[in-house]
């Protein structure tokens, strides 16, 4: 039997992600999204209910997440709750991915939102757990609780992949 996988993509949609850097003619967001779309379309093509995807947007104009009433979780929006990805949800997601008009929003807090999505969905069952953060690193980050967050990720066996361009 194939392993169950839960992957949450955190997409930095801050205004700076609309810039073109490193000599590219495409925006930083479009460059990073090539990797994300490749991974998500592979998951959709596999058509397995045990390959689950969630999408969290960072540095968004609005706020929509379970922790939004707590300080520090503003400008973070869950675009898709963790679960199987379908073609229709993929199309809907594609329409919502564009740079925002803000630079506010904390990547560390977005990771906390992603960890919460994964823990809530997978419970203590056997899953491969992964968070993929796509960012240009231009947003402010509050690293006060990073040791506790790192410990929580290790305890939950969550792998973190960071795709960035610091140009």
Q: Residue ranges of each PLM-predicted region?
A:
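Intrinsically disordered, low-complexity, Ser/Thr/Glu/Asp/Lys/Arg-enriched terminal regions and linkers
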Residues: 1-167
């Amino acid at each position: 039997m194939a392993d169950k996988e839960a992957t949450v993509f955190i997409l930095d949609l801050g205004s700076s992600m609309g810039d073109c850097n490193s000599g590219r003619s495409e925006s930083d967001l479009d460059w990073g999204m090539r990797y994300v779309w490749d991974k998500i379309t592979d998951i959709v093509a596999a058509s397995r209910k045990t390959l689950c995807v969630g999408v969290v947007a960072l540095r968004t104009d609005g706020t929509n997440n379970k922790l939004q009433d707590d300080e520090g979780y503003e400008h973070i929006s869950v675009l898709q709750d963790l679960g199987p990805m379908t073609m229709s949800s993929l199309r809907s997601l594609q329409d919502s991915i564009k740079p925002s008009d803000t630079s506010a929003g904390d990547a560390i807090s977005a990771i906390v939102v992603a960890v919460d999505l994964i823990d809530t969905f997978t419970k203590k069952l056997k899953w491969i757990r992964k968070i993929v953060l796509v960012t240009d690193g231009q947003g402010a980050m509050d690293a006060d609780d990073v040791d506790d967050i790192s410990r929580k990720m290790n305890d939950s066996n969550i792998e973190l992949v960071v795709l960035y361009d610091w140009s």
